[in-house]
Amino acid sequence: MSFRLAVFLVAALLASEARAAGGNTDVVRDLATRVGPIIGSAQLCREIDRPRIQVIVDKFQAVIREASPQESDRTDLQQTFDRSIADGRNVVSFGKIDCKTAERQFSDLERSLGLSSSNLSGVIGPSSAAAATAPTAPLPPAATATPTSTARGVTDNEIKFGIVGPFSGSARELGRQMKLGIDAAFNRINDAGGIDGRKLRLIAADDGYEPSRTLDAMKQLYDKDQVFGFIGNVGTPTAAVAVPYALEKKALFFGAFTGANILRSDPPDRYVFNYRASYAEETDAVVRYLIKLRHLQPRQIAVLAQQDSYGDAGFAGVAKAFRALGIDDGSILRLGYKRNTVEVDEAINELKQQKTAIRAVVMVATYRAAAKFIEKTRDLFPGLLYTNVSFVGSTQLADELMMLGPRFANGVIVTQVVPAVGGYSSAVLEYKNALGKYFPGEAPDYVSLEGYVAATVLIDALKKTGPQLDSEKLIDVLENTRSLDLGLGAPLNFGRAEHQASHKIWGTAIDNKGKYQSLELE
């Protein structure tokens, strides 16, 4: 289907407020994948006014309601629409189309509907469904000033950082949320004048959460885009490729979204800094909770671990926790599934064969695989406890489970490395204010909060380094960071022998409304 034909068809539906669309979910789903990217691209372009976009979003959501009398169908169509909008944002973020093209496509859609910017005054405000669709802040413009610094990625006007993560594939929401949080922190400091007059700019490269693509993504950012350093890279198996490359180039590798030990050498690698607690610390906390507070026997605890270095890191943390409690770790049941899949049937079959009843599963998984495992075992093993580490993607996991029904979500535990996003701590309030200002409609999320906190720690060090910025000076400043209080409940510290700022773990559990509630782990 051509772009103009898609525009014509969706215009026909929208203009009639979907009176002819009732029950035709296949047509609407197809159109959602075509009009969604147009809307997503428009949302990242400052030249396209928000009310213009909102009119079409609201109209298409009316189409969804009319076309899907069943709630499950409506949810499915809305998710397709939201994913397509996110894809459109990525197209602009990655430079595949520019805002001139986005404006032209959006204007074609408006003309087909008989709309123009002149008759959009007083339109309806953002609806809750549209609010979930996307950021509105544009990418910062490229610097044009002649650089006075010889440091890579630094000019008189900007400092460029790179992020490699999954912006496509089954884990893409983790990459999007991490980038969102960093961008919110960068936008906040940029509006305050930047760092010594320099604006911070984040450039993304997609590796799809596949290590085979990570090296090319790193090279693209370092060689082609000439970034100063890396912040917020996502994943453990991908970090196994990215970290050696960053070390070879002596490039800063900061605040990655992983708790694996590959980023926690002893003594620390000079160019690698972590904000978050490790997977070993997360799994240690949850094992102690299960044994000491829930009174489970060690043999009643199993591990579902992704079959790669991420899963290995989480499983190693469980084994370490067993040993610390004086328990033999040799008999721990390890179940597995392949990365970027939801193929959990083999793991479930193995669970069925156990002579000792398993009462808890510590999951080292991504949100879709974790949700699929819970879906298929909730009735098979009544009362089974499920725990997850923070990398799972808390919001996405809750959403997936609530689509199945509250009984699938209720009681599922997730350990966190940031405070509750629904709380009122200074750090969380600052984050939510920035998120609301720069990305209106985006809901607070544990992953984007982590990105925001990591970026804020980096910004503090950049300020202290001064205008003559280079990597070595910045790292010296980072290694001298002491008692940095961001309002997280505990001060953050780095040192020459300590490149992990936080060791704090927060416990949370999903309630029957899909919301996270605090859970005392000790």
Can you describe what each PLM-predicted range is?
Residues 213-216, 261-262, 269-381, 421-430:
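Extracellular/periplasmic Venus flytrap/periplasmic-binding protein
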Residues 147-155, 162-181, 205-211, 234-235, ...:
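Extracytoplasmic "Venus flytrap"
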Residues 126-131, 437-449, 459-515:
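Segments of small-molecule ligand-sensing domains
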Residues 53-133, 226:
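Compact alpha-helical subdomains of small soluble proteins
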Residues 161, 179-201, 324-329:
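Signal peptide-proximal N-terminal region
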Residues 93, 100, 147, 173-180, ...:
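Beta-alpha junction/loop-to-helix N-cap segments that form part of ligand/metal-binding clefts
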